[in-house]
Amino acid sequence: DMVPLTGLNRALVAQGLKVMRRRANAGLAALADVAGLDATPDSGHLGFLLGPRVNAGGRVGQSATGSDLLASDDPVQAAALARRLDDWNRERQTLEAATVEDALALVEREVAAHGGHAACLFIARAGWHAGVIGLVASRLVERYARPAVVIALDDSGQGKGSARSIAGVDIGAAIIAARQKGLLLNGGGHPMAAGLTVAADKLEALRDFLAERIARVVTDRDLTPELTLDGALRVPAADRALWQSLSGLGPFGIGNGTPRFAVLRARFVTAEPVGRDGAHIRAILSDETGRGRLKAIAFRAGGQPLGQAMLAAARDGLGVALAGTLRADDWQGREGVQLIVEDVMTGAPQTAAS
C-alpha cells in the first residue's frame, strides 16, 4: 500500500479487483467474509481490511498461513484459515495499540528535547514486537508530519527497524546511504518506506546521521501538514451518484490519490466518539440551512485536535468546512456515501475561492 498505483502496478491492481469481485478464489472470499466486507472490493479494502489480515500471520511468526489461504481451493479449509488470520489480526491490533502508546511517550520526550523541531523522529526500545513497528512508524508520521524510524531491539543486541516518510524526503535513499557508511547491518527501501537491521552500539551514530541528512533537505513547510483539495461542494451534492462517477478514476492509492473535497457551509447534526476508547469520531452533517444528510467519520481522531474540534463545533452549533474523501456506505444494504474527515475549520470564509 506504499507503492505508487501508476503504470503496470495500477493495471495489475485494477485487473486483480475485477477478479476478486467474482469471489472465485476460496481464500479471498473467506477473508472478505471474516472482515465483514459486503461491498464491492476496492483498493481501500485491500489496504485496510484484507491486507492486514493476510499479513497478520507474519507479524506473529506464522507467515505461511496467508499464502496457504490464498492457495486454498477448499472453502472449509479457507474459512478456518481466514478465522485464524482474523484472530491474529485482533492480537496485532492490541499489540500495535500498546506499542503506539509506548512510542508516543518516547516521541513526546524527543520532541520536547528538540523544541518540537526534530526533522526526523527516531526511537528504539527493547521488548517491542518487530512485526508492528512499521505500523507504529506510520502512526507517528500521521500524527507528527515528519519522517519516523522505529526500532525493536532483541536480546542479541540487534535492532529491526522500519522507517516511513513524507513527500519530499526519500527515506529509502537515506537508509541505503547509512548502510553504505557502515552504520547498518542491512537496509533498503523506497522514497516513502524502508527497513533496516542495526547493531545496538550503532544507534546513536545512526540517529545523528539520519537527523543531519534529513535536516539538510527538509524545510519547515515540509513539516507543516497540507491537504490538496480537488474540488468544493455542499452536503446535498455529496451523494452516491457523485461517488460512482469518481470511482471510475480508481483504483486509488499512492500516486493516484482519492479525490479530496472541501465540504462547505456545513453543520453537525450529531457527533460522537465511537470505537475502542472513543478512538474515532462519527458524525452526521447537513448544510447550514438543514438540507441534506451526510454521514462522516474521522478515524483515530479521538482525543486529538481534529476530534476535539468536531465535538466542540457540534456542541456549539458552529458552521464548519471539512476536508475529506468520499467512500461508499453499503451498511445493511444501504447504497449511500460517507465522508472520511481529514480536517475541519470553523469561523472562516466558506467559498470555493477561499
Name each model feature, range by range.
Residues 147-150, 183-184:
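A short linear hydrophobic-aromatic micro-motif
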Residues 9-52, 56-106, 138, 142, ...:
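Acidic, two-metal ion nucleic-acid-processing modules in DNA metabolism proteins
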Residues 4-5:
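A structural signal for small-residue-enriched, beta-sheet-centric alpha/beta enzyme cores
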Residues 149-165:
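Short glycine-cluster motifs
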